[in-house]
């Protein structure tokens, strides 16, 4: 039944909409989580510093270092650092120490993975990773005082010289080149610098004298500037260039401390430059182009290198005493001795903080944070040096049991990690590691600390250059991406742990700073499994959701070495990941064990299990958004819902579902995997030059390498979700125990006097609601993960091809859409874009004559949700279609086209029908257009719902029927559009293609597909014949309608189809344009020799009330109906047809009178508005005779028409007839009053003759006596010719005997009128004229009646003569007497 299928279709549509809605909801969860991850505080916020003039202090509270004392937090034993390896010094170097005479130094060059050692005038370098690849330089004769590694300025040296080694002696400064044999020319990539291939060029590139300056340290900027610190307290720079100029040397030394100053030094700033205070450290902030120096006495100076890094200006200097004083004022209770001396300064780059720029570390481990410009002004240049925060090391809180750091001699600060080496004794150091990676979102800053013993005295401590993921910043997300880098916990899935190297006389110590995921791995391995108290504590410390996200990094790992750990992590994920809960915020009390700092009411609604030994995790975890952020909660407070019933039961309102840590952890992990690209633009425009012109290309915003990384992570997550389907089925263990259910319904209070069993049932049902809601959400997330993986896999595939070419093949609208589309949009909603991109990719293969089978299979494997089996079929069909264009053989081309048609027909309900049909038109495969369109219509509506909808009057409530009906019409439109195109082409002017578009020489037409008129006509006929074969009734109807609209009714009537007559009958009954369809219907009947039916349709047309049909047309319809009826009676002798013919003839007679009335009104009264209405009424319908007389002829005084009406009706009233004739004559005379007598006589004669010929045969309506008498009176009055009336009657055809009879009676009636007008002889004159006519032309009377008529005339003349004799004699009487006598003689001769 259609209704059943309709329900199925509605269900299918509803399912698709539900899936889309689920994806949208999952996408919103990810949006929120991503926003949460991006809301991490700046360093200044962690330090609670609001402005440079509002300094703060920290480190004195127990919670600043929550691990520093017992009882603060029950946390697992988490290692902060992990030793990778210890590598002893190469034996060759140990021997060299025996030859030392003056000086030795040691350090690290992380960019080239080398450690270095100077012994007197020699320098040695080796790979600190393994102690190998030892190299040395002994080309100097003086003791080396300072060493520096420089990345050279661009464009000065050959590509293989990637670094410069700068050596300073008491005499000169030598710059050597470091060459790498395995550098790819022009690539800028150093291939495996740690595995050899490095060579120290023996000849110095530059050498210049020191001018007796003792240099202590060398540093360089990223753009190649070299700075040196002098023992004299001056800052020097070595400026170098490729060639010497007119006014500059190739290499020269500049003293920035003694050179002329380009600025006015503020009076408050006291600079001291003396040999007593050497500069011992130079630090460069390459992110802001600022240089800092630290002197031996603790003076810190600030230099501004300018926006471009090429300038130089000293802007601030602060002495150690000033710093100690400022620190003492901030931390008033602390002994000021811990604030000096400063042993290290470190740059805080813009990627870590916008407001804090410099950190100084004292010998007691105190950190001093400085700012050089106002807060919240990232582009401001440095203008001061202000202490904004004092951070005390562990051990300063009241309850701390940790020993305070002391004798710190080396310090390293890197991305929030502070490493300090303190001298325990002469032989050993203690390595401190302090960081806030565990609490990156917590304000104020909370840190963990760890100490470990290091053998030997630390000579150097350095961070090894770490991998950094570039932020994808595009026009769509640039306002949402923080300037600073995300915390480690957010990036730990894609960045390795930070690596450090410590050098001592014993060798190199390599170690990692562990990320939370590394710490979790350590716990899993040490506990040998996924459970244990330590692991549970880890989940509590980091919160369930954050710990689950971290756990997933291990659980989703596909590395072979992680297989066992992955299984343990999976177990921990499900064991400690929590469960969905129902929360009642209004009743949850603050846990009693939460201290004053953590027990803020803002956390009182977080679900904390009763009796938990832990402080509220929302104030400690990573991040501090709450254990289950409200954004991931689902309100369940709809009226009448089960949640509301439970609320009523306990006197509460507003319960909400709080998803489990497992659910939220999956969201967090997915958001972090996708975070770098989720809301980024898909593409960016790049401008490059080619042949001196700029070309704009559209490129992917994400490089392939990043896509590969994201895909690997997504694949692991997808496999995890597929592998562990139980994640949506409830927790491990028995979920139905009462105790556990109560825990999951946080804040649900037991009624004091309530029904315990009923409450337990409510609790159980609540829990099941929460579980079901979470299950639905997780299924949506799983689908989102799957779609994301496939969308990105497709994007990577596009990038691996010629991306700009593929995008260039897209339509302009898709190209523009791409620019405003994010990866999120691509995944969730932009199926059209993905389809267009895939089509473009395949088209590139086809264009290059490459088979699409391979790429099609690859797409099916890579992204089956985006490229299905049907898509593969479509690609194959498209390939056949495109290749057919290149085939010369007509037979082969047709074979390929038919094969493509078969492929398209398999998927016709999904194919882009208009596009394919357009291509078929281009190759003139019109059969394909018809067949494919009809197949598509059938597949889109297999049950014929569209026809059912049409035949039942297109009811509004049948939504499914309307949809299928419209889909069918859209399919048929491809056929009718093609037919229209052929019709237009067949009618096009033959010469039009040759009309030039502009003046100039002739241009040959470049369109090879242009059809001639004849070809177009031929293809039209062929296509129409093919279309007529269809058994699809709805298509036939669509075809008929198109033929009508295209004014091809003749073609329509040639169609022999069982559907045509019913369609025309239906449309003639229901369509607004009924006249057109009825006109076609009678023509159809007539063509098929159904004359009786044609006559009846024509009769209905004539009778139809419509302003579209004129009265003239109605007469034509009646006339055609009469002809058809006569044809019908000629074929068959059915009585009804004869009667109908008679009715038609009568109808025709009345209709003619109606036309006469209308024409008379138009002719005589067209200027009257009321007459116009009457004329329109006469057009609108056929009227009966009574209505014509009463509403038109009589009111408008249309005497002729009234005469016609009574004549037609057979109504005889002599008085009325006389009146009408009199009116007719008088009107004619009145209308011609302005004319001459002869013209008036002519006009009246014409009118009388016209009417006389109509009515003379019916004396009742042509009263000759009255007419002649009235006319003669008018003639006499107007003094017209005496023979006018006789002549007129003669033209009418009135016989002379009858006319003589009328005149004779008129004469004998002795009417006094003639005497009144003084023309008593007028009638005798008329009779004389009449008889004279006879005498002169006897043939006017029939031969058989001539003798009798002659005798009658003689008798009459005798009588007239007698009458004349009785009259008094006058000239007139004598004249007429003579005339009659003469006439008498002539008559006698005729006798």
UniProtKB/Swiss-Prot annotation:
It is found in: Nucleus, Nuclear pore complex; Nucleus membrane. GO terms for molecular function: structural constituent of nuclear pore. GO terms for biological process: atrial cardiac muscle cell action potential; miRNA processing; mRNA export from nucleus; nuclear envelope organization; nucleocytoplasmic transport; protein import into nucleus; protein localization to nucleus. Residues 604-630, 985-1012 are annotated as: Disordered. Glycans are attached at residue 526. InterPro entries: Nucleoporin_Nup133/Nup155_C (IPR007187), Nucleoporin_Nup133/Nup155_N (IPR014908), Nucleoporin_Nup155 (IPR004870), Nucleoporin_Nup155_C_1 (IPR042533), Nucleoporin_Nup155_C_2 (IPR042537), Nucleoporin_Nup155_C_3 (IPR042538). The keyword Oxidoreductase does not apply. It comes from the Eukaryota. It is a peripheral membrane protein. The modification Phosphoserine is found at residue 1057. Disulfide bonds: none annotated. Disruption phenotype: Homozygous null mice die before embryonic day 8.5. Phosphorylated. Phosphorylation and dephosphorylation may be important for the function of NUP155 and may play a role in the reversible disassembly of the nuclear pore complex during mitosis. It holds the Pfam family Nucleoporin_C. Belongs to the non-repetitive/WGA-negative nucleoporin family. Essential component of nuclear pore complex. Could be essessential for embryogenesis. Nucleoporins may be involved both in binding and translocating proteins during nucleocytoplasmic transport. This is Nuclear pore complex protein Nup155. It comes from Mus musculus (Mouse). The gene is Nup155.
